[in-house]
């Protein structure tokens, strides 16, 4: 026959066992929650690292709005440009936004100006052969460039309009023989294409001959060419992402916005431009010298084909 004392002992034993089992279960649950939290944090970190722009920089150099030891614009060529994200000099002007999966090109007025311009840039220059500016292409050889772009931020002028910037270019270049023929000190030739982000719209400008009967030698001089009237696409992109394509072939240049609007250039001016070599440019060639002005341009994708 059980006594009250024995029942009490039995109760305490059962209670003790239940308490320990419950403590173990709580500990297991806490450990599971802790493991899940760690896993989620790892996934978030992994996800952030994975948002990379679709841009191969191995055939581009960049010019930044900061000067080097010689007082000239600071440039980074391949292969060093591949480490732009950790380059302390580049970081304020060309940096990775891993949340958006884009490279941001940041430009503002500084003393860092290239020859033949008053404006500054954080801009890529195509190098078909890495580290070499002397290998370029002609219209007859053909070329294609595509970019996925967005204006991230821009200052405004006194009238309330956003400052404009050039986001893509095709720049002409004299061969060494052409340079020597006309006695020019460098290989610079005019840009046949400038694509602007202009107060939320995309504006295109090209070159036209002042005299369509000029000789081949006369064509090599920059003053043989004039700016055209320019063209605005109907779509307003504002600060939204958009896609630009540039297709070049013999005597023809086509610019496409978002796969729906086209601007085609062909005829005598394009045909005679065939005398020049060319290279692509892309980024943020900022078109203001106003104090405090700036712009930031995102590139999610940039590809070139020849």
Feature-to-residue mapping (PLM):
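Short, aromatic/His-centered strand-loop micro-motif at the edge of beta-sheets
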Residues: 207-243
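Bacterial Sec-dependent N-terminal signal peptides
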Residues: 1-28
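Ligand-recognition surfaces built from glycine- and aromatic
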Residues: 48-62, 142-144, 156-160, 267-306
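Short strand-turn-strand beta-turns centered on an Asx-Gly dipeptide
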Residues: 256-261
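Secretory/extracellular carbohydrate-interaction modules
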Residues: 86-88, 94-211
């Amino acid at each position: 026959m059980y006594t009250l004392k024995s029942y009490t002992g039995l109760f305490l034993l059962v209670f003790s066992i239940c308490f320990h089992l419950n403590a173990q279960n709580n500990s297991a649950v806490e450990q599971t929650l802790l493991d899940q939290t760690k896993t989620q944090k790892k996934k978030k970190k992994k996800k952030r690292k994975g948002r990379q722009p679709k841009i191969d920089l191995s055939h581009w150099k960049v010019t930044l709005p900061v000067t080097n030891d010689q007082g000239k614009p600071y440039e980074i060529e391949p292969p060093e440009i591949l480490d732009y994200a950790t380059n302390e000099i580049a970081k304020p002007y060309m940096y990775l936004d891993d949340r958006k999966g884009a490279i941001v090109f940041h430009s503002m007025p500084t003393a860092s100006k290239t020859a033949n311009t008053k404006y500054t840039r954080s801009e890529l220059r195509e190098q078909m052969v890495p580290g070499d500016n002397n290998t370029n292409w002609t219209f007859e050889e053909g070329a294609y460039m595509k970019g996925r772009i967005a204006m991230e931020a821009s200052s405004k002028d006194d009238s309330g309009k956003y400052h404009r910037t050039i986001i893509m270019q095709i720049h002409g270049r004299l061969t060494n023989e052409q340079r020597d023929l006309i006695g020019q000190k460098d290989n610079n030739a005019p840009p046949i294409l400038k694509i602007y982000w202009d107060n939320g719209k995309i504006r295109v400008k090209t070159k036209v001959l002042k005299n369509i009967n000029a000789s081949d030698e006369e064509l090599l001089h920059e003053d043989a060419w004039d700016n055209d009237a320019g063209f605005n696409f109907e779509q307003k992109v504002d600060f939204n992402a958009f896609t630009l394509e540039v297709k070049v072939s013999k005597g023809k240049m086509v610019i496409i916005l978002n796969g729906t609007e086209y601007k085609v250039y062909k005829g005598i001016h394009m045909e005679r431009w065939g005398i020049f070599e060319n290279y692509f440019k892309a980024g943020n060639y900022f078109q203001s010298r106003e104090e405090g002005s700036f712009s930031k341009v995102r590139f999610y994708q940039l590809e070139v084909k020849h």
